[in-house]
Amino acid sequence: MPKLIGAAAVILDSEGSVLLVKHSYGKNNWDLPGGKAEENESAEETAKREVLEEVGLEVGVEQLTGIYYDPNYDMHHFVFIANNDNNRVPRPSSPEILECRFCSRDELPKPISDFPVRGMDG
């Protein structure tokens, strides 16, 4: 059983574009907002907290779209569809986030991790 749990959120705007964040660490990949669960935190709670920490949005989690295993970290990643209830504009709100923006499937930036593409397919 994997020791770590992670969660991410697929947040779409009114045109169906997905919110992506660019991290300041690692390979500077574009990714879905999300991260590692804290002790005794559910995957859904993790997704909500990480979105708030990374881009300043309070979101509602609607449904689980997929669970993906990352053997490099022995971690399960839970990916949820979430909504931006207040229609607020996302802004980087953590030093670990360089940039955030909504991107259509046809305009996904590079380099990009696997999770945004998988999440959009969910």
Predicted regions and their residues:
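Conserved Nudix-box catalytic region and its N-terminal flanking loop in Nudix hydrolases
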Residues: D13-E53
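Short aromatic/basic micro-patch
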Residues: D31, E58, F102
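A generic structural signal for short hydrophobic patches within well-formed alpha-helices
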Residues: A37, L108-P109
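A short coil-to-beta-strand element that immediately follows conserved catalytic motifs
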Residues: L57-G66
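Conserved N-terminal beta-strand and adjoining loop/helix that marks the start
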Residues: M1-V18
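Residue-level preference for beta-strand/loop junctions
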Residues: K3, N28, G60, D74-H76
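Conserved hydrophobic "DFG−1" position in protein kinase catalytic cores
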Residues: I11-L12, L20, A82, F102
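Active-site-adjacent beta-strand/loop module that shapes the phosphate/pyrophosphate-binding cleft
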Residues: Y69-R91, R101-L108, P116-G122
